[in-house]
Amino acid sequence: MLENSRGAHESGPRLHPRFSWGTTLLVSLVMLLPCVWQSRIQSIDLSSHIYNAWLASLIAQNQAPGLWLAHQANNVLFDLLLAGLLPYFGAAATQQIAVGLAVLVFSWGAILLISHRRPQNWWFVLPSVAALSYGFIFQVGFFNFYLGLGICFWYLALFFSGRWQKRLLITPLLALAWLAHPLPVLWAAGLALYTAVAERVPAPARLPLAGVAVVVLLGVHFWLRVAYHGVWSIDQAWFATGANQLLLFDRKYSVPYALLLAAWVMMLWGLVKERRLRAIVGDLMFQRWLLAAAAVSMIPAIITFPQYALPLSFVTSRLSLGAGVLLAALLAQVQPKRGEKVVLTLSALIFFGFVFRDAQKLNRIEDQLDVVVAQLPRNSRVIGFLRIPSKPIPPLLHAVDRACIGHCFSYASYEPSSRQFRVRVAEGSPIVMADYDDVASVETGEYVVKAGDLPVFLVYLCGPDRQQVCSHQLREGEVIDSVASVHEPE
């Protein structure tokens, strides 16, 4: 049923009446399974996050010359969680606990937001949420953003169903989410503002109101491109469904992506037949997804803020995750047919099968990396160049960070020089590069070793299939990529 024209509020976040605490626990355990099914969680930036949590502990003990902790109001919540857990649980368990908590916050926030209209639609909700929870944003390890977005899902689920008293009471959730990352808060605040205004206008006036909101987004688009050198492409519109979260590191992921998208299209067609297009377009839930899709399409994918050495990147992929959950909230109003249930289930099973197999391969390489790093002198400076040729985004980009914990220093760790995180570096630190341009050159393999870097070791993929790990003590004037092209161990 559509909302009333004025002052209507949607039903509150609720689960199926038979969805007991036991079932809630079971679903939570299933959601957490990918956090414990391998020896390590494979997520690109996670290695950097846990390593810098270890650096933060060294800073607190005055054992990290040239490093210091910045006091900042955002992009720190996940890092604070890691830093708080690390002294008590060690690096391995800390990663599993912190990531597991983030997954539960995100997945249950998404479930409540998707299910607030039709709580009994579990055949649709669970496969969709599971896949989105472990999609691209999880795999690249943007956990401050991920955690912040999960908190914002809880906020929106409560906001959409509450009157002004409840809406005021839940405002602190936005402050907590801001501590994680500002982008989800701006996204959620925009949706909440639109909802609050739309509820107070007649239903026929809501679509023009959405048009005004799109024009505002267009203004933001041009402002970011001019003021902050935003990089934008028309291709961003392809990300509006959020199904692209299933497209990971190679072409095989196009199979679960296509299946999920097909199931969603079939359900959308069923919703159109059940509700009629005009009724759907006038629905607040559709308009929220429309605005989220417009943000995906219009907000530049890369934004350069002057206070940071590293641009805010993958903005389109980040926003598409929220758009995917809002589209799922719209589609959850129709019960999937048997064929759609099969396609949704197949999509999730194939996706997680691929994720498991890829994580297994990466962990085998990381096992070798641990052995090689352990053989290097204690407190050595180490550079990692672990590019897998067939992967457009290197999944082991920061793996040497994790391998160095407690033994060595990842000399090209990107967080301190980026100025986006709380661990910062001063010029001349013996622990990590202070210039982000040097770090970026290391990642591309173009860096030329300087006298001031020595002594420093390189660990890199070697062997005919690039599945082995080798080490080399670098010399002044050597180029990272040239050394890494040697396939045989020294």
Model-derived features: positions:
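Hydrophobic/aromatic-rich transmembrane helices and adjacent perimembrane loops
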Residues: 309-336
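Membrane-interface transmembrane helices that cradle and orient dolichyl/undecaprenyl
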Residues: 152-168
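Transmembrane catalytic cores of multi-pass membrane glycosyltransferases
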Residues: 35-48, 62-63, 70, 74-75, ...
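Transmembrane-helix motifs of polytopic, lipid-linked glycan transferases
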Residues: 97-118
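Signature aromatic-anchored transmembrane alpha helix within multi-pass, membrane-resident enzymes
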Residues: 333-357
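Short periplasmic/luminal acceptor-recognition loop of GT-C membrane glycosyltransferases, typified by
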Residues: 362-365, 372-464
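Short acidic/glycine- and proline-prone juxtamembrane loop motifs at membrane-interface regions
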Residues: 138-147
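Short hydrophobic/aromatic helix or loop-helix immediately within or flanking a transmembrane segment
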Residues: 51-55, 68-91
